[in-house]
């Protein structure tokens, strides 16, 4: 079959955009730990010496946002002025408003409740917080049912952070990126063609040392040996120097790494970001639900590859559309899989929140190294608890 290449990237927790994602989700978690019914849309921007936290938050609790900001930056590793960004000396500005009452009225009471289709007490009473379409994806390329390029890229970025924090490579600094190019034979990944690592470092270390150490301590422990061969290309800091990094090197914004957060470009994306948003925002909760559905379909053996699209209207509880695409790998027709999805998954916002127990402070841990396919943390949308039911029902169709 034809050989082809596919590439995905990831970034470390010290990347400027990821700093912002983590701050936004740290604020969300702090609020949810006191007020699980809060409405939160928290956006962050960082640049040299400055953090701006803004957005719309409606809650009955108080959280110390500057303290949360400094603590998050400290955990990431920007705790010294020589790194170009210091958690203790950077300025923190906040500008927070309440959620618009025009939006709140649609979320508080769904159209179905207003028109008498459902009672206020039923789960329909919560409407979607916005319109839009969200995608979820799963495939059998890895044990966690993720595309191999993004899976390896995340693991490399995570390893880069680990060797920095545990002192193995103590000259590394928090900012960094990874990129993996995988060669496919048809739709099967067969080898890694190129591995790219860019990592911030201290000025005292030479290029050859960095390249040797990164290959030995980051790449080889992560990439399975059977995927590497004599033709695999290793690119480490290809500019030759990466001392200035983090917010000193580039400004950062919440929600600017949506492809890193999801499937590395391997599947479609509806365009909505995740971090800083409470689960009434379907940009986040419905994307999690779509992954949950797709993963259970693949885990059930109904398809080797599955993409689920959900779409919503603001203030309306039920999805306006549900679509399943198995790319020709399904063992039963897609319309039958869609009927199983509608039967076994409650895709109304309140149904998603209830099924996945989303009104909890679980979000900061997702804000770096991907929201999907995580094996290092327990995320409810990664469960495959519906797979057996789907498998049994499919056998009877």
UniProtKB/Swiss-Prot annotation:
Q: What class of enzyme is it?
A: transferase
> Which InterPro entries does this one have?
ADOMET_SYNTHASE_CS, S-AdoMet_synt_C, S-AdoMet_synt_central, S-AdoMet_synt_N, S-AdoMet_synthetase, S-AdoMet_synthetase_sfam
Residue ranges for the region (Flexible loop) are 99-109
Assigned GO CC terms: cytoplasm
- What is the annotated signal peptide range for this record? none
Identify the EC number(s): 2.5.1.6
Q: Which reaction does it catalyse?
A: L-methionine + ATP + H2O = S-adenosyl-L-methionine + phosphate + diphosphate
> Where is this protein localized, as stated in its record?
Cytoplasm
State how it assembles. Answer: Homotetramer; dimer of dimers.
Q: In UniProt terms, what function does this protein have? A: Catalyzes the formation of S-adenosylmethionine (AdoMet) from methionine and ATP. The overall synthetic reaction is composed of two sequential steps, AdoMet formation and the subsequent tripolyphosphate hydrolysis which occurs prior to release of AdoMet from the enzyme.
Family of the protein in this entry:
Belongs to the AdoMet synthase family.
Protein name (Swiss-Prot/TrEMBL):
S-adenosylmethionine synthase
Question: What species does this protein belong to?
Answer: Acetivibrio thermocellus (strain ATCC 27405 / DSM 1237 / JCM 9322 / NBRC 103400 / NCIMB 10682 / NRRL B-4536 / VPI 7372)
């Amino acid at each position: 079959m034809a050989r082809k290449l596919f590439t995905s990237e990831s970034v470390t927790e010290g990347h400027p955009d990821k700093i912002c994602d983590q701050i936004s989700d740290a604020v969300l978690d702090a609020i949810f730990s006191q007020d699980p019914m809060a409405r939160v849309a928290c956006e962050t921007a960082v640049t040299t010496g400055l953090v701006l936290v803004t957005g719309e938050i409606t809650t009955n609790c108080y959280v110390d946002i500057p303290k949360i900001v400094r603590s998050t930056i400290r955990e990431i590793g920007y705790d010294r002025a020589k790194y170009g960004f210091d958690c203790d000396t950077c300025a923190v500005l906040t500008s927070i408003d309440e959620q618009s009452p025009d939006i709140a009225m649609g979320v508080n009471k769904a159209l179905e409740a207003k028109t008498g289709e459902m009672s206020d007490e039923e789960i329909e009473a919560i409407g979607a917080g916005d319109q839009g379409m969200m995608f979820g994806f799963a495939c059998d390329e890895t044990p966690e049912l993720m595309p191999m390029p993004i899976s390896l890229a995340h693991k490399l970025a995570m390893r880069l952070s680990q060797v920095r924090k545990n002192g193995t490579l103590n000259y590394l600094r928090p900012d960094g990126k990874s990129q993996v190019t995988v060669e496919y034979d048809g739709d099967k990944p067969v080898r890694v063609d190129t591995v790219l690592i860019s990592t911030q470092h201290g000025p005292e270390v030479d290029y050859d040392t960095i390249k040797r150490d990164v290959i030995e301590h980051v790449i080889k422990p992560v990439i399975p040996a059977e995927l590497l061969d004599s033709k695999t290309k290793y690119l480490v800091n290809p500019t030759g120097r990466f001392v200035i990094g983090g917010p000193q090197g580039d400004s950062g914004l919440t929600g600017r790494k949506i492809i890193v957060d999801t499937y590395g470009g391997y599947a479609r994306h509806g365009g909505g970001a995740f971090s800083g948003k409470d689960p009434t925002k379907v940009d986040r909760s419905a994307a999690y639900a779509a992954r949950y559905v797709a993963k259970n379909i693949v885990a059930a053996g109904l398809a080797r590859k599955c993409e689920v699209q959900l779409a919503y209207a603001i203030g309306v509880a039920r999805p306006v559309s549900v679509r399943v695409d198995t790319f020709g790998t399904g063992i039963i027709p897609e319309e039958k899989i869609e009927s199983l999805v509608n039967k076994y998954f409650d895709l109304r916002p309140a149904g998603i929140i209830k099924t996945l127990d989303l009104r909890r402070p679980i979000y900061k841990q997702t804000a770096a190294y991907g929201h999907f396919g995580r094996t290092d943390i327990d995320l409810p949308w990664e469960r495959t608890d519906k797979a057996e039911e789907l498998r049994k029902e499919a056998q009877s169709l």
